[in-house]
Amino acid sequence: MYAVFQSGGKQHRVSEGQTLRLEKLDVETGATVDFDNVLMIANGEEITVGAPLVAGGKVTAEVVQHGRGDKVKIVKFRRRKHSRKQQGHRQWFTEVRITGISA
């Protein structure tokens, strides 16, 4: 059984027991989070696709940790001008473990 839900402007395909990183959520570590924006649920051969959401569909997850991703370097280089600009960015994330999918 798997589901596709939307969180942080992105769509995620998940199944029970899976761990994934989402955009930072404002919840405590160890808390339970319910995602109601379920776009599709597949249970064996039975597939339910929402228009746009599945009525009564819910994905439940437990927050494992919060953290920051790897550094991404941004470099702007102007050739022949003796000019260079460097910047770095680390995106905040929330790691969750999927505990249940219901339709």
From Swiss-Prot:
This is Large ribosomal subunit protein bL21. The keyword DNA-binding does not apply. NCBIfam families: L21. This protein binds to 23S rRNA in the presence of protein L20. It holds the Pfam family Ribosomal_L21p. Part of the 50S ribosomal subunit. Contacts protein L20. One of its GO terms (biological process) is translation. Belongs to the bacterial ribosomal protein bL21 family. The keyword 4Fe-4S does not apply. Keywords: Ribonucleoprotein, Ribosomal protein, RNA-binding, rRNA-binding. It comes from Aliivibrio salmonicida (strain LFI1238).
